[in-house]
UniProtKB/Swiss-Prot annotation:
Protein name: Porphobilinogen deaminase
Coiled-coil residues: none
Keyword set includes Transferase: yes
Record gene name: hemC
CDD domains per UniProt: PBP2_HuPBGD_like
Length: 316
């Protein structure tokens, strides 16, 4: 039988390649006569390293170049960290598969001199590195005595900056640390009570052409239904709020007794205003769960906070 050839578009960062190689390996294991190749490239978000992510904007910052490859027929699928994939995709493309989720939580990584501290016991003025406005707003809300500083670069670069003494600690996604073999550097998993994670964090999203039935059938072998239900609810929540991955919006989701539990948070940039609530709904209608939670937060003033943030972005 003739091999079916499938080309994957991927970012060329170490983490992206680890994730893409995992997808390649799993597809080839599960689909007989499948030949998978990878086209690695840099995205805008990979190239601009001297500006805070929030100031660049986030419309396809880490995805646009990969999507262009699919739209011109140079790639069949693109593998993304789902948290980087915008909730509104270009015409002709769709989120075809969501893989089983790694731990979605944020993690504290500390310098050697600070390994006796947890996040809640760090001395006043400690320098905490994060590039995420979501983490920044929540941690400012809980720990206003700490000094937060922007940090850019890939996971390895950030750890090197920490070890060089630029920061006392940094906050990273636990999933990325584990996938890159840095699990031993996880000093503390940050509880949801302190910091809700990003939408889709810990899961991989496989994007493809909307009308490519053969490719959709192939990638469906990697679909994890519970992860998909949770992440679709999270993404619907984010979409309904018209937020992006660089806005202070956090979530947590779980499935209990055939019900989908979704907690969501919106905060001001300074962390002084933080709105958090939960919605419990039908596991088979995750989109509705996300929309209903967004409505609850809007009624409490979330849309006012977000419009102020967008106005600040426009001014800057």
């Amino acid at each position: 039988m003739t091999n079916f050839k499938l080309k994957i578009a991927s970012r060329r960062s170490k983490l992206a390649m680890v994730q893409t190689l995992w997808v390649k390996d799993q597809l080839e294991k599960n689909i007989p006569n499948l030949e998978v190749s990878i086209e690695a490239m840099a995205t805008q978000g990979d190239k601009i390293l001297d500006v805070a992510l929030a100031k660049i904007g986030d419309k396809g910052l880490f995805t646009k170049e990969l999507e262009a490859q699919m739209l011109v027929g140079q790639a069949d699928i693109a593998v993304h960290s789902l948290k980087d994939l915008p909730t509104n995709l270009p015409s002709g493309l769709k989120l075809g598969c969501i893989t089983k989720r790694e731990d979605p939580a944020d993690a504290l990584v500390v310098s050697k001199k600070n390994d006796c501290y947890k996040l809640e016991t760090l001395p006043a003025g400690s320098i905490v590195g994060t590039s995420s406005l979501r983490r920044l707003a929540q941690l400012r809300n809980k720990y206003p005595h700490l000094n937060f500083k922007d940090i850019r670069g890939n996971v390895i670069t950030r750890i090197e900056k920490l070890d060089a003494g630029e920061f006392d600690c940094i906050i990273l996604a636990a999933a990325g640390l584990k996938r890159l073999g840095f699990e031993s550097r996880i000093h503390q998993i940050i509880p949801n009570e302190i910091s809700l994670h990003a939408v889709g964090q810990g899961a991989l999203g496989i994007e493809c052409k909307s009308d490519d039935k053969k490719v959709l059938e192939i990638i469906s072998v990697l679909e994890d239904k519970p992860t998909s239900q949770r992440c679709l609810a999270e993404r619907a929540f984010l979409r309904e709020l018209e937020g992006g991955c660089q806005v202070p919006i956090g979530v947590n989701s779980s499935i209990q007794n055939e019900q989908l539990y979704l907690t969501g948070m919106v905060a001001s940039l300074d962390g002084e205003r933080l709105i958090k609530d939960q919605y419990i709904g039908n596991i088979d209608d995750p989109e509705q769960v996300g929309k209903e939670l967004a409505k609850k937060l809007k009624l409490q003033g979330a849309d006012k906070i977000l419009s102020e943030i967008f106005e600040q972005f426009r001014e800057n």
